[in-house]
Each structure stands twice: as C-alpha cells, then as structure tokens.
C-alpha cells in the first residue's frame, strides 16, 4: 500500500506523488511513516526528508514548517524545499563554508542566531546531496 505525499512551499509544489515510506525530521526527532499511520500533525525541523519510492531512497532538504498525516495522505508545508538531485554540490559546499565563517565572526546575539540558522540550512543542503545510508 502507498501513501500520497505532497511537499509544498509558499511558491511551488515540490513533490506530489505516491511513495512507499518517508522519514521526516520533526522538532522532536525523526519519524518514519508507512501506510495506515496514525493521524498526527507535527512541526517540521530544518532537516532531511527521506522518501522511499520503488525500493530507492530519495532525499529532500526541508527548511522548517509543519506536516499533517492521516488517511494515507501526507501534506508537508515548509518555508523552502529542494530535492537533493536538484542541488548543485559545488554551490552548496561554498555556501556551507561561508556559513561556517559567518558563525565564527558573528557578534551579538542576533547575528549569532542568524548565522547558526544559516549554517543549519547549509548543512542540510549538503546532507541532501550526500545522504548517509
């Protein structure tokens, strides 16, 4: 049995297709979702969405939002999302290096928070390209 997964951002539909299973990064940790999962609504953290489709795992970088699961329907509404296959590895690595440098030179509470958030986003994009099995 399959699940219908929709991943939406304010500007576009990133994914709208049937899947076999997903692993979703939530604010309280990762959760695996199979068909007939109990209905839940949860906050989505900055992290990787793993999608199992035809016995292959695909990855997507999610930038926070929320998800609703029920009746074999999963709707994920996020600030931004990118399929791992759509991310330019060189650009993502450069962004990560810049973010790491910005964390080191950040001054003041607000700058440190913003720099750390940018670093989390950059790390997530790199991880989506090179998923750990």
UniProtKB/Swiss-Prot annotation:
Q: Which domain of life is it from?
A: Eukaryota
Alphabetical UniProt keywords: ATP synthesis, CF(1), Chloroplast, Hydrogen ion transport, Ion transport, Membrane, Plastid, Thylakoid, Transport
- CDD domains documented for this protein: F1-ATPase_delta (cd12152)
Q: Does the keyword Ribosomal protein apply?
A: no
**GO CC terms, sorted:** chloroplast thylakoid membrane; proton-transporting ATP synthase complex
Q: Which family is this sequence assigned to?
A: Belongs to the ATPase epsilon chain family.
The subunit field of the Swiss-Prot or TrEMBL record says: F-type ATPases have 2 components, CF(1) - the catalytic core - and CF(0) - the membrane proton channel. CF(1) has five subunits: alpha(3), beta(3), gamma(1), delta(1), epsilon(1). CF(0) has three main subunits: a, b and c.
- By what name is this protein known? ATP synthase epsilon chain, chloroplastic
Species the sequence originates in: Atropa belladonna
The gene behind this protein is: atpE
């Amino acid at each position: 049995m399959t699940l219908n997964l929709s991943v939406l951002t304010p500007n576009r539909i990133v994914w709208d297709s049937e899947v076999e299973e997903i692993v979703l990064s939530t604010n309280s940790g990762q959760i695996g979702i199979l068909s007939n999962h109990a209905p839940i609504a949860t906050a989505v953290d900055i992290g990787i969405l793993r999608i199992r489709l035809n016995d292959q795992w695909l990855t997507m970088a999610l930038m926070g939002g929320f998800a609703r699961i029920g009746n074999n329907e999963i709707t994920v509404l996020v600030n931004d999302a990118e399929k791992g296959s759509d991310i330019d590895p060189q650009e993502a690595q450069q962004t990560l290096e810049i973010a790491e440098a910005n964390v080191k030179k950040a001054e003041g509470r607000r700058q440190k928070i913003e720099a750390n958030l940018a670093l989390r986003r950059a790390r997530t994009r790199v991880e989506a390209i090179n998923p750990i099995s």
